[in-house]
Amino acid sequence: MSGQADTATTAEARTPAHAAHHLVEGVARVLTKPRFRGWIHVYSAGTAVLAGASLVAVSWAVGSAKAGLTTLAYTAATITMFTVSATYHRVNWKSATARNWMKRADHSMIFVFIAGSYTPFALLALPAHDGRVVLSIVWGGAIAGILLKMCWPAAPRSVGVPLYLLLGWVAVWYTATILHNAGVTALVLLFVGGALYSIGGILYAVRWPDPWPTTFGYHEFFHACTAVAAICHYIAMWFVVF
């Protein structure tokens, strides 16, 4: 009986009606996706490659091997995050399975990006002990966040967004030390970038504003905030290294 049921299910899955249903769903996704969806992160990924390469090269040549390695970790995390996001949002995935796995990867890479952004600050702008503590917190939190996104992809935004925010504001506990070792400019840029990331995360969570749903919606505001915040943190890296 089980074999007959499986055969019936397979036959049903191959019917024209079933195929038409999937076609309609696919067309609906394409038509409802804002035209700007993903493009901000496409350009951000390309910019990150060029800007990151210059930062790593100069850090290694003029700074130190530690500066080169830490900025390399930061650059790799930034490029990967923007690339995965751009790929997920620009491609019209025909396979629901592939789309769901890319969504998990997209959300997971935000945790890697946060930890990667902290790495130069932790190893170059903090005392050795404090730096190790920060690295343990942010990378441990990143691993936990990745496991959450991979194992519980349907987790509500009220769970994921607060985790991003909590992990992103670890630097608050080391404000005085960062100010002393990296300077006021680096600290201001760090906090301005953090504020923009937080604002973007909140806009994503509440799905607002959404003024032009077919062109530039709330998700694009979120991506715009992350792009500008990344610029702030990139500039801050130069002050941390030099």
Swiss-Prot record:
Disulfide bridge map: none
Localisation: Cell membrane
Superkingdom, natural source: Bacteria
A GO term, aspect molecular function: pore-forming activity
Topology within the bilayer: Multi-pass membrane protein
Major location category of this protein: membrane
TM regions (residue ranges): 42-62, 67-87, 108-128, 133-153, 159-179, 186-206, 222-242
Listed GO CC annotations: plasma membrane
InterPro entries according to UniProt: AdipoR/HlyIII-related, Hy-lIII
Keywords (A to Z) from UniProt: Cell membrane, Membrane, Transmembrane, Transmembrane helix
Keyword Transmembrane: yes
Family label: Belongs to the UPF0073 (Hly-III) family.
NCBIfam families: hlyIII (TIGR01065)
The name this protein goes by in its record: UPF0073 membrane protein Mb1114c
Native organism: Mycobacterium bovis (strain ATCC BAA-935 / AF2122/97)
